[in-house]
Design a protein with these regions (language model features):
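Short helix-coil-helix linker/hinge
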Residues: 30-35
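A noncatalytic interaction/capping subdomain that flanks phosphate/NTP-handling catalytic cores
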Residues: 7-21, 25, 36-37, 55, ...
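Hydrophobic positions on the alpha1 helix immediately C-terminal to the Walker A/P-loop
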Residues: 256
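Short capping segments at the starts of secondary-structure elements
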Residues: 42-51
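Conserved lysine of the Walker
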Residues: 253
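Generic anion/oxyanion-binding catalytic loop in active/binding sites
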Residues: 28, 41
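Eukaryotic partner-binding/assembly regions in large regulatory complexes
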Residues: 1-6
Length: 411
């Protein structure tokens, strides 16, 4: 616990006054007695209830057997201050018990909140409690707080649009969602390791989905820090690889992947969003639960085959792009956080690496079968060429090995 900066003790009396956002929130000041004043002064630095109890017991020389009652009194006083908004719990101290653990794209998440608070969309990504406890240390602690925040956190606004406002403040980031009516605010630590979502209990299916959607920017921020980036795209499995199809809103990426399903019986992977990372020398696509309205997702990880950028046209045409054009177009389809120059550079460098090492196609096309046939033909040709090149490389390696071995024997 520590004091909310919008409350200040002024002058020599025992009155505490509000200012700034607290005035706007119509929060009143308060008068403190001697004991409350001493606790207030202690809370000028972050304190636990246990630490406050020990310090007050030492100051008033309270016997050990009476310190249990003292702890209850201090806990009650702190709860009053929390309700009043005069103190706040620092990020990193979840309230309640762990309601479940999730494992998404290698990121381990512990969720705290009311019973049954975890959205059903995460069911396929739940972890069991077994295994090595050391390996179960969470990468993200997510607190789902079914209440209003004690006060609204102001800060420097980084982005603001119809759907999301992101501001930076002393402990990290604040998210606000104008279109998600039962989500009040999200407070997230600067390193993405802890987030607290203030929300109202959902009263319909739309509001239940809102909580699931509100968690997405928290996850994508942490994923970005781990070298994984999200591309707005539909994906399918072909030649044992994930192929991503992306284009402007309304382009018909789902329609295009449906053509593949109809013509070539290719399995879908995700209908709207794909998370790409790199493991060793390979780019991979991770299964994630967010998939737009398609309800198409997977928990599996697949090697990335390539990216197909789609554009409406009266006929089918594969257009050649420069490396710079590929990088720019891939980055434009990414939805990993671009809130700061540093984050934007991360997106750019990753898009550049993908464009350099994996095929990026630009297909101007119709919604006819010929669109899928055109790009499939090109993919097959390139995959055969790549495989032939790899086979030749292996043959050359095998030829060199005996020669090198012979030279060693002679020496």
């Amino acid at each position: 616990m520590n004091l909310n900066e919008m409350y200040q003790k002024m002058g020599i009396d025992n009155d505490v006054y509000t200012y700034g956002q607290k005035i706007a929130d119509q929060k009143r000041g308060m008068e403190l007695n001697e004991t409350a004043l001493r606790l207030w002064e202690m809370l000028e630095q972050p304190q636990t209830v246990e630490a406050l109890t020990d310090k007050m017991a030492a100051y008033y020389e309270i016997p050990k057997e009476e310190q249990g009652e003292l702890a209850k009194d201090i806990e009650a006083f702190v709860q009053e201050l929390l309700v009043f908004g005069a103190v706040r719990r620092e990020l990193g101290c979840p309230k309640g018990s762990c309601e479940g653990r999730l494992h998404i794209a290698g990121i381990k998440i512990e969720v705290y909140g009311e019973k049954g608070c975890i959205p059903k969309q995460f069911d396929a990504f739940r972890m069991t409690d077994g295994g090595n406890p050391e390996k179960a240390i969470p990468d993200l602690i997510l607190e789902l707080a079914e209440r209003l925040p004690g006060s609204r956190q102001n800060g420097t606004i980084l982005i603001r649009n119809r759907d999301l406002t992101v501001a930076i403040w002393e402990e990290g980031y604040v998210f606000r969602f104008d279109t998600l009516k039962n989500i009040y605010e999200i407070w997230m630590k600067e390193d993405g390791s802890y987030a607290r979502i203030y929300y109202r209990c959902p009263i319909n299916e739309e509001e239940q989905d809102s909580l699931f959607l509100a968690i997405r920017p928290v996850f994508l921020f942490l994923a970005q820090r781990r070298g994984m980036f999200a591309l707005h795209s539909a994906s399918l499995l072909y030649l044992e690889k994930a192929w991503l199809f992306s284009g402007p809103s309304g382009m018909g990426k789902s329609t295009h992947t449906a053509l593949w399903k109809k013509l070539f019986a290719t399995p879908f992977l995700n209908g709207d969003l794909n998370l790409i990372g790199k493991e060793g020398e390979k780019f991979v696509v991770y299964g994630i639960p967010w998939c737009g309205t398609s309800k198409i997702f997977t928990t599996e990880k697949k090697e990335l085959g390539g990216i197909v950028l789609l554009e409406k046209a009266p006929s089918e045409e594969l257009v050649s792009l420069t490396e710079e054009q590929k990088t720019l177009r891939v980055m434009q389809r990414m939805i990993s956080p671009p809130w700061t120059a540093e984050l934007m550079v991360k997106n750019l460098k990753f898009a550049e690496a993908v464009a350099k090492e994996k095929p990026v196609y630009f297909l101007r096309c119709t919604k006819n079968d010929t669109a899928a046939e055109t790009i499939r033909r090109q993919i097959e040709e390139d995959e055969k060429r790549q495989k032939a090149g790899s086979d030749d490389c292996m043959k050359n390696m095998k030829k060199r090995i005996p020669k090198e071995q012979a030279q060693e024997d002679e020496s």
